[in-house]
Amino acid sequence: MRGWQPLQKLLEAAADSSTPVAAARLHAHLLRSGHLHSSHHLTSHVLASYPTGLARHLFDEIPVPTPRLANALLRAHVRARQWCDALLLIPCLRVRPDAFTLSLLLKACAMLPALAHGRALHALAIRSCTAYTDAFVAAALVHMYAKCRGMVGSINAYNAFSEPDMVLRTSMVTGYEQNRMAAEALEFFSRHVVGQGFMPSPVTLVSVISAAAQLKDVLNGQACHAFVIRNNFEYDLVLVNAILGFYMRIGAVQAARRLFEGMTEKDVVTWSCMVTGYVQSGDICEALTAYKKMVEAGIKPNAVTVVSVVQACSLAPDIEEGRRVHDIAVKIGCELEMTVATALVDMYMKCSCHEEAMQLFCRMSKKDAVAWAVVISGFTQNGLPDESMRVFKCMLFGGPFPDAVTMVKVLAACSESGVMRQAFCLHGYLVITGFCDKIFVAAALVDLYSKCGNLGCAVRVFESAMEKDVVLWSSMISGYGVHGLGQQAVELFQMMVASSVKPNSLTFVSVLSACSHSGLVQEGKRIFESMTQVYGVVPNAVHHSAMVDLLGRAGELQEAAKLLHGNGRADAHTWCALLAACRAHHDTEMSEVVAAKLLKLDPDHAGYYNLLNNIYTFDENWSSAKENRNIIRDRGLNKVPGCSAVELNNVMHTFTAGERPHKDWEKISRLLREFSRTLKGGDCFFQLDNHLVFEDF
């Protein structure tokens, strides 16, 4: 063994150390012994073991550096993930780059990404012929172009190489998969790997499985799984995790569970796959159970796990578990990572804890458009559209440029506030930014104008759209329905079908609601029956609720009840629609039956008790009304007060039941009393029905 080889082992160990002290001591020993200047091999190890700043200082002191020393300096920067600094070293290296130099620099270009620098390096590789002869350079070129979203460059680099090996072929498959070109990835794998007799590696198969998952290609995914079993690749945990993710992605939860239970080794990725898969399949209880088992097994969650569990808590909703997960995110140091923080803000918003959401949002050092959109949407969901608009204004002045998805959230907030002038301003902004050309933005605009009472503008936006998808058609149908123009809504539905646009679940909600508001019973029945028979759309609770409302308004209570009893999955909202119809048609006997069913489904909803109380009051059943009020008091239930708003001279005036905060309340009250006297005087055609006026208990 040469005299410097033990020193090499020590330097390699120092490179793996978290502090530069050991490397500095060895450096001093090499200087004293004279080994440093006599062996570039040892010098390269010193460079690799030092922090990048010290390594650069040492490199600059070398009179005539070699490619090996230059590569050691580059490797130190790449290991530290200092991609930009690695590229800035190019003019300071003072050597002609070899194949290894180009591979390191191309990796830095891929990770930034820096396509222009990558192309310049490609030209250098062509001049030195390494692009055609060195497999590592060719693979680095393919990887760089793929990361820079330039698969044409990857294809050219691959085709230029004389004899591509398995590494280069794997780079192509991975590049296609990472660029969401799953079909091309599977085709390349079939033609250039399997078709030419190459044995795919586990790395190749991970990309193939991921491509099959993107396409939800059950046949190819299962074929890969069988190949893994036949070739004893089940030892590769990364590969098995990819198969697990594939089964979850295609909705084969039972197959994923069987694979999971048969795994002898499980890491954090394995558990995260299960949690994420359960969330995506809507099985929130299983997701939270899997997470708890993971913690019990001593597996430390990572950022991906935290995001999935937080999403589960959002959907549950379970604020207490969400807070516990937040604490774990703080402990493992990922709380303020963009994806984690955004998921936490969304969870707090969906659990009606908007103050906690804003505290976390304000602590985020970086906020992308998704984070801002979550806050804007969250305030709207919590009934605070004015706060949504305030946040949007802050985004315009100090945040990232809003994307189209963010603007849809802003339009939804504006539609809740109902300020027409604001709607016009937002429409103008969308025209300037060019977002109006996107169909889903046009659909949100139609919905905005409809809810603000300007059906004419909604129609003009709809008619000006160059393309119309099912969402845009549904928004316009809903707009007609909101304005009581049910016949026009039905006619538009027929035009949509004639235009070869297949209606979806949302479309039927819109058209059935329109029929309900306009009393179009027969049309509503016909459309409801056509859902399954003609269009293959299975009615859900919302459709049944719309039909119950339609039949109830028409007085067909028995048929509405029959429809509900035939649907075993009817929710509380659907039964509430029938109870409201019973109240409107004074059917007390059916009201009590429906109320019993309703309160069994949701015993803590104050609004249902309020509705039942109005029925008892109308029948002058004071004992039942009193008993009903006692239940509300004993359970501590509070009904959210009704709120009305009117825009006057660009100012929104809000009136809440039971409150008198308006500065002109006395004038308004005096005018209302005059209207009441006029109505009761008999000089007008309208006669007030005192039975429908009750004091809110």
Regions found by a protein language model. Give the residues of each.
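Terminal (and in a subset, N-terminal) low-complexity or junction segments at the ends
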Residues: 1-165, 171-267, 273-697
